[in-house]
Amino acid sequence: MRSLSGLLLLLTACLAVNASSVPTLPDDIQVQENFDLSRIYGKWFNVAVGSTCPWLKRFKEKMTMSTVVLIAGPTSKEISVTNTHRRKGVCESISGTYEKTSADGKFLYHKAKWNITMESYVVHTNYDEYAIFLTKKLSRRHGPTITVKLYGREPQLRESLLEEFREVALGVGIPEDAIFTMPDRGECVPGEQDPVPTPLSRARRAVLTQEEEGSGAGQPVTNFSKKADSCQLDYSQGPCLGLFKRYFYNGTSMACETFLYGGCMGNGNNFLSEKECLQTCRTVEACNLPIVQGPCRSYIQLWAFDAVKGKCVRFSYGGCKGNGNKFYSEKECKEYCGIPGEADEELLRFSN
């Protein structure tokens, strides 16, 4: 469920946002199929967030992972929400209630002070591992806001779940640079204060650049020199907190695979596209790999080397989980796999 105090703080700041800066709120939000309310109860860690609210990007460096506990509410029509988080160096806990609706997986929160009703939807969950919540708010005066949050039963989640969350957020119009993970500083006890930094740590912080600190505010860094020399490195997410989709070359599978880049530092095995990755890192050994369409259904017409026929052939690439035997033109395929051109073939016939 939405982090209650974090949600209210976010939406308060967003009241000053003009409606023209955010997308139209979707009307056809699909909740988790066969939603089971009793299984969503318990403690969740707020692992990642994305929002159309510009305030979020300005203050995301101050946000850390919080916990949310959901239990049955004081009435059969409500659920209770308790959020525990750090705010201004002090751990605090705030409780509230959400109203059930006739649609399973959809809840309402009404703030009389602002005369705003927020709608929250459980769009994806497997109950035991993760849950993705989408909240939309419409202010008649200031327009719509969409916020998506990823929760986990544990502070760390599989990268495939982070990718699923990212796709959900992008799908409702949230910009890529407004989607990020929450730094995990551990759970806190309400009332306790964060330790005061020592003079030594203050001095060290003063000389660090924003990228070295890993604030999450840095821009993607991909201008490494001699990127081909980095192809055998393991991928590096870097210390920042963004969720930027990138490609890295896997020397074992001889394929370019996706990973989520934090937005700063990392290494040179980091590419914006599969094409750039393959054309930088692929070797001639790729010509001996099988032709793999992959499970996705984009049906992109590419070229591959057919080792049985001994020539380059067209094939339909699904768009994901292929291998290095994938070329973007017939010429490229022939150059990699040693197929002679027409002039070369004529020369060979003449010399024989």
From Swiss-Prot:
EC number(s) from the headed UniProt entry: 1.6.2.-
GO CC terms for this protein? cell surface; cytosol; endoplasmic reticulum; extracellular region; mitochondrial inner membrane; nuclear membrane; plasma membrane
CDD domains in UniProt? Kunitz_bikunin_1-like (cd22596), Kunitz_bikunin_2-like (cd22597), lipocalin_A1M-like (cd19418)
Q: Where does 3-hydroxy-L-kynurenine bind?
A: 53, 111, 137, 149
Q: Which domain of life is it from?
A: Eukaryota
Residues under site feature: Inhibitory (P1) (trypsin): 297-298
Classification via PROSITE patterns: BPTI_KUNITZ_1, BPTI_KUNITZ_2, LIPOCALIN
For this chain, the annotated S-S bridges are 91-188, 231-281, 240-264, 256-277, 287-337, 296-320, 312-333
The region annotated as signal peptide is 1-19
Alphabetical list of SMART domains matching this protein? KU
Instruction: Kindly list the residues the record flags as site (Inhibitory (P1) (chymotrypsin, elastase)).
Output: 241-242
Keyword terms of this UniProt record: Cell membrane, Chromophore, Cleavage on pair of basic residues, Cytoplasm, Disulfide bond, Endoplasmic reticulum, Extracellular matrix, Glycoprotein, Membrane, Mitochondrion, Mitochondrion inner membrane, Nucleus, Oxidoreductase, Protease inhibitor, Proteoglycan, Repeat, Secreted, Serine protease inhibitor, Signal
Question: What InterPro entries does this protein's entry cite?
Answer: A1-microglobln, AMBP, Calycin, Kunitz_BPTI, Kunitz_BPTI_sf, Lipocalin_CS, Lipocln_cytosolic_FA-bd_dom, Prtase_inh_Kunz-CS
PTM per Swiss-Prot/TrEMBL = The precursor is proteolytically processed into separately functioning proteins.
Q: What tissue specificity is annotated for this entry?
A: Expressed by the liver and secreted in plasma.
Annotated BPTI/Kunitz inhibitor domain residues: 231-281, 287-337
What residues are glycosylation sites in this protein? Answer: 115, 215, 223, 250
A Gene Ontology molecular function term of the record: oxidoreductase activity
Query: Which PANTHER family does the protein's record reference?
Result: PROTEIN AMBP
Q: Which family does it belong to?
A: In the N-terminal section; belongs to the calycin superfamily. Lipocalin family.
Q: Which named protein is this?
A: Protein AMBP
Q: What is the lineage of its organism?
A: Eukaryota, Metazoa, Chordata, Craniata, Vertebrata
- Gene behind the chain: AMBP
